[in-house]
Structures are given as structure tokens and as C-alpha cells.
Amino acid sequence: MTDNIHKHRILILDFGSQYTQLVARRVRELGVYCELWAWDVTEAQIREFNPSGIILSGGPESTTEENSPRAPQYVFEAGVPVFGVCYGMQTMAMQLGGHVEGSNEREFGYAQVEVLTDSALIRGIEDSLTADGKPLLDVWMSHGDKVTAIPSDFVTVASTESCPFAIMANEEKRFYGVQFHPEVTHTRQGMRMLERFVRDICQCEALWTPAKIIDDAVARIREQVGDDKVILGLSGGVDSSVTAMLLHRAIGKNLTCVFVDNGLLRLNEAEQVMDMFGDHFGLNIVHVPAEDRFLSALAGENDPEAKRKIIGRVFVEVFDEEALKLEDVKWLAQGTIYPDVIESAASATGKAHVIKSHHNVGGLPKEMKMGLVEPLKELFKDEVRKIGLELGLPYDMLYRHPFPGPGLGVRVLGEVKKEYCDLLRRADAIFIEELRKADLYDKVSQAFTVFLPVRSVGVMGDGRKYDWVVSLRAVETIDFMTAHWAHLPYGFLGRVSNRIINEVNGISRVVYDISGKPPATIEWE
């Protein structure tokens, strides 16, 4: 019998902060299960979830506006600890009898918070001391409004020069509010504060660990599918690979993986997928060579969005055909992860909503009435990688840079041809190999090569030749929403360029993309 890893759980209500998913990830890192719901959740839903504690996130709205979001009143009547962060603190203060005002002085960035009163939330936590021995905390502020009066049964725990109520608390009810972001690394003791709230105040055990998550997933898969057969589209990417390994552990040969080789993969990737999952791990894999079919469908097409749609359509067609060949398959497995599940709400604020499946694979034939198995749907990407390591997948495969779903179809600009893909594969492999050799691969967030459908004059021996151009692209980013181009050493870039031009017959020029995002996107198409 596996432990109930969902026994202790934190509910995070989202008011629209860009950091809300980070709050959830931090709670998970503490070994505690949590879910992220929209702020306009009902009392019945909260009761059914039965949280051990509730966190109210930050948000971009102003609590002083008439129709701004509010926490359900039941949050403060449920008898569990509540932790308000920024906007969450402000709405808590207002709803419980305090006062919030817009501030002329927007506080954004580092601040030092002076601790005035002892509190269970920060007891023994400090970054430095004042001259008279009071604890100081280095925190990250991001707010315009501020609490100007706290509810009558709260005490002021800490303040800054411009923010009189930086931390407030009602120790009896276990309600806490902070006017800064404990979830970001800039708040140096933020993780300790979250740990204090989740583990000590809410008394949650650290049950959410990779080994226990695997045991729980295996048990749930077996309970869901029994002795039925399951099909999975295996791409070799992180999510589908970890899904395959979990299902294989749970049901063994009752899993059939369909690997569609579309001719748009990286150098030797198809062989690596078959060797690793077929030969090494012993999974049941159907290898479908479909390069000609994909390239034929893409012939003559230059528009990036049209190319994406063609690749998606042909994949579904090929997968459907293979699925129909298998007998008695009752379940379709997908590598849906938790961020896929968090979707925009149809509520007034458009905040994150949960509980709706995001389907990665398109419509299966209507005659195939299959159930859906999504063993990763509670997990963030970093958790999926940790699970993969625990299941024996290699680190280099789990932590390699992102690769687009359409593959080289969007890294060959314009029309996609086999000749272009073959040249690009080899050039890209050289770039990645050199990054690894120079210990630069893990220092950049994403690196790849782009094929440009233009010929450039080159000199080879005593003759001139017109051959193709490729661009190297490497970026540094935290969230992939914005990115800086990576300042790779000139000597390194020269070495990569020389190797590509000398070793890949058909490429005469190598350029380096120095565009940031924005205005450019990370991928060229």
C-alpha cells in the first residue's frame, strides 16, 4: 500500500501574479502537494479539496477598485492557516476590516524589512541585525497599493520606511500577510518563510517526493487501466519519455509506444530513441518511418504557420493509422503536464483555471473509443525531470535544451526539403557538440542552428562556390518569455564556424544571431 501523498495539501488561489506558478513550485519543492485555482472558487470546491492551508497569490489589480478580485469569504472561515502575498495580503486586510490605499510611491525591487514583533512565520529567520539588535530581512517588493490599517485582531510584525505593514499576523487564527514576494530568489529567506508556513504552521508532512510520486502514479495507472492495453505516441521528448517509463513500470507489455519518425528530428535521434527505449529499457515500440510522407506534404509550403499545421495533421493521420492496426487498445496515454492543465479562465479576470485536460494528440478516429491516461498531469516540468532521473533516464536526455514540436520543420526557413534538413542536422550537431566540449551547454538556456534558404559565395581551394548559409542561435533566459542573446566567446564561435564549413559540404557561411526577445522570438519561425 503506497502512502497517500495527497493527504496534506495546500490550495493556492491565483489573483493573476506572474509569480503564482512559482509559488506552487516552491511548495512542491518543500515536499508538499498543492494545486493552483482561480480566486473565484466556490465554498463547496474548497470544502471538497479540504486544504491543510491556503495561500493567496499576488496580482496586478488594485484592491481599491470596486470590482477587483476578492478571496471567497469561506477562506477565512475554514479554520485553516492563510498566507496572503502582496495582493493576497491586501485583500485579506480589506476583507477582515483593515484598509488599503493607492500609494504615490510604488515600491519595486529590493527592500529591507525591519522585524518589530515575534511571529511563528519568521521566528529565528533573519538576514542581518539593526544597531539595536532587531532582525532585518532582505526582500523583493513589487506593489503600488499598500495596507494603511490592519484588521483590529492583527499585529504589525515588520515594516519598511515606506511600507508600515510589511508583515502582519493573527497568530491565534494563523493568518499571515506579507507585502513582498517570498517565492522569488531575491527574497533571500523566502523559502524558509514558505517552509515555516507549509511545514510548521500548516503541519504538512513532506510526502511529495520523486520516489513516492512514482509509486503513487504506478498504483493509479494500474487501478485505472487494469489489464487493458494502452497506446502512447513516443516522441523522445521529456514528457512522453517519462510517461512511457511510468506506464512500462505499471503495465509492462500492455503498453505499445508508437514512434513516428517524421524526418524532422535531430542527428541520429530516431536511432537513439529506438536504442534507449526498445533495446535498453525493453519497451514495446512500433517504429514508423514517415519522412517521405511528411516532406511530400510540406513540399512547396513556405508559410511557418501552415507548415506547423501540416506537420500536426500528418502526425495525427500516421498515428491514427498505426493505432487502428493494434487490437483491443482501450486507452490513449498522453504526456500532459500541470502547466498544460492550468488554463485561462472564462471568468472576468481571465486568471488561471484548472481542471480541464489539454490534449497533445489530435482527434483519434471516431471508431476508437478510448479512455485517456495522463500520469504527469499533476507535475511541473522540473518535477517530471526528477521523476525521469528516478526511473533511470539519462541526465543529458532529460535536461537537454527545448526542441520545437514541429522539429526542423520550423528551423529550416521557408520550404522544407530533405537536403536542407540533412545539412542542418549535421551543422546543429557540431554546434551542440562544441558547446558541451567547452562546458557552455548548461550555461545557455537554448542553443540551435537555423537553415537559411539563401546561397552565399565562398572560396574553396582555388575556386568559388555558392552554398547555403546557417545561423547559430543561443539565448539566456529564466522563463522563455524574454531572453538575451548569449555572449559566447569569439574564439568558440570561430571554432564552430570553421568546423561547420569544413565538415558540412554545402554550407559556405555561418552567422550568429544577436537578437533579444523581444523584439525577436527565440525560434526564427
UniProtKB/Swiss-Prot annotation:
Keyword Ligase carried by entry: yes
GO cellular component annotations of the record: cytosol
Gene name of this polypeptide: guaA
Annotated protein name in UniProt: GMP synthase [glutamine-hydrolyzing]
Role according to the record: Catalyzes the synthesis of GMP from XMP.
Source organism: Salmonella arizonae (strain ATCC BAA-731 / CDC346-86 / RSK2980)
SUPFAM superfamilies hit by this protein: Adenine nucleotide alpha hydrolases-like, Class I glutamine amidotransferase-like, GMP synthetase C-terminal dimerisation domain
Catalytic class of the enzyme: ligase
Molecular function terms, GO-annotated: ATP binding; GMP synthase activity
Catalytic residue list: 86, 181, 183
